[in-house]
Amino acid sequence: MPKLIIDLNATKENAINELNDFIDNRLHSYESLRNYDLGEDNHQNVSLLSPYIRHRLITEQEVISAALNKFPLPKIEKFIQEVLWRTYWKGWLELRPRVWDDYKDNILINNDKKQLLEKVLSYETDINCFNIWTKELIETNYLHNHARMWYASIWIHTLKLPWEAGANLFLKHLLDGDPASNTLSWRWVAGIQTKNKSYCLLYTSDAADDVRC
């Protein structure tokens, strides 16, 4: 069962404390370390603030203001950009409600794919890293951002499952699941968000035992 935000001891005070801890101790190395997924319960190289932002215990503006009070923009520009992407995607989707409606209309899996979906949800595909990510997603309600892209790429381009069903799985389980960021990220991996551009992980069976593929 997906966790609730309350499971994080999530209060405004707690969110501010987490924000300050990140700024004081980890923000300085965010840009150089953010791309590495070190595995379950080892995500201190990213902010881990997304659940608090998603549930509005803190806002993007509060995060940016606090960060800029500690560091000049050139030192933390990548982090600021990542925060601003959240607001950009929200605005983009609000202006295109049909995109959201189309996603909701296509989240069901066809009968010919249901057996494969069962393997996915029971961690029994032939792709070890994919199984590990599915387990982490369902049991911890979190995935590193790059793991989310890799996962979506395997889901769409290797397993040939519909992107809408994958986006729905994420939105159901992610504690920080944001309708706009989640939907549009899956569309981008599928190659329908940005014309003539998709995200395709070059997965090979030789990488099957590597958690990061």
Where does each model-flagged region fall?
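Residues lining hydrophobic/aromatic ligand-binding pockets adjacent to catalytic sites
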Residues: 1-205
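Single conserved hydrophobic/aromatic residue that forms the stacking wall/gate
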Residues: 206-213
